[in-house]
């Protein structure tokens, strides 16, 4: 595996890139970390990035602005710019076939916002379907609790407005393939919210584009978990999805 750290994609914000060995054709997974939009880091992704690289998928781990210094939608704008930057520059590191976008927890909220509110990727010269597949891991499909909190609203409220990915479902006729991951012991109401998001997509006729992975775990604990066989649980979830929706390899 090759590692390229601290790639500045805009002033003050960087990406860490984990790549397969030189000369290999690969896919690219642009990943947004969790932390409630107020903490977390792009660092420390090697436990799943290394096995993904061994199976032909590079990982670009993205730094983005967070509360309290940021305000909505700064973090979404940053992530859109990171995706566009990597799409434009990944050829400098080798031959890339496909582009995937995803994230865990708050990162899953961010990947959903890019997937469903087309304005963010359109602002950087892309459209959501330019991404071949999305991996939404335990993200909040309603308005994120910290978006509510920092707007002066009770963070326990369930609100579906323009700050919520679910608000935009059905506004586009076409969606890329996508995977939702959720746990039976996830954050309070996250399991039910995820099922509602999936059912809403199905109601609009997109059942064939959606996959759902259930984990027996606490919230996102599988992301850096190694199973009894010594393999990354998260990498295996991702590769299982990709191999299903892209059987040609």
How would you name each of these model-derived features?
Residues 1-23:
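N-terminal cap/lid segment of alpha/beta-hydrolase-fold proteins
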Residues 25-35:
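Short beta-strand element of the alpha/beta-hydrolase
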Residues 43-60:
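Short amphipathic alpha-helix adjacent to the substrate-entry channel of hydrolases
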Residues 70-90:
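Alpha/beta-hydrolase active-site loop
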Residues 84-149:
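Primarily recognizes the serine-hydrolase "nucleophile elbow" in alpha/beta-hydrolase
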Residues 126-128, 133, 139-147, 157-193:
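The feature captures the conserved acid-bearing segment of alpha/beta-hydrolase catalytic domains
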Residues 151-158, 184-210:
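Active-site-adjacent alpha-helix of alpha/beta-hydrolase-fold enzymes
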Residues 195, 204-249:
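C-terminal catalytic histidine-bearing segment of alpha/beta-hydrolase fold enzymes
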């Amino acid at each position: 595996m090759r590692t390229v750290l601290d790639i500045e994609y805009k002033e003050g914000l960087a990406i860490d890139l984990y790549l397969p060995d030189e000369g290999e054709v690969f896919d690219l997974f642009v990943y947004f970390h969790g932390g409630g939009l107020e903490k977390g880091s792009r660092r420390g992704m090697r436990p799943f990035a290394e096995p993904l690289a061994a199976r032909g998928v590079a990982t670009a781990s993205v730094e983005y602005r967070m509360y309290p210094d940021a305000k909505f939608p700064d973090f979404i704008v940053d992530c859109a710019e990171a995706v566009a930057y990597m799409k434009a520059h990944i050829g400098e590191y080798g031959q890339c076939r496909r582009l995937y976008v995803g994230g865990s927890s708050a990162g899953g909220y961010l990947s959903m916002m890019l997937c469903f509110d087309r304005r963010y990727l359109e602002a950087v010269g892309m459209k959501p379907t330019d991404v071949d597949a999305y991996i939404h891991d335990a993200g909040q499909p309603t308005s994120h609790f910290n978006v509510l909190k920092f707007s002066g609203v009770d963070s326990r409220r369930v609100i579906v407005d323009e700050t919520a990915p679910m608000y935009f479902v059905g506004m586009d006729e076409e969606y890329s393939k996508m995977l939702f991951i959720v746990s039976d012991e996830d954050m309070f109401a996250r399991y039910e919210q995820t099922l509602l998001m999936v059912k809403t997509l199905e109601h609009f006729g997109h059942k064939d584009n959606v996959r759902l992975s259930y984990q027996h775990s606490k919230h996102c604990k599988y992301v850096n978990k190694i199973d009894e066989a010594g393999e990354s649980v998260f990498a295996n979830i991702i590769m299982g999805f990709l191999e299903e929706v892209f059987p040609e390899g």
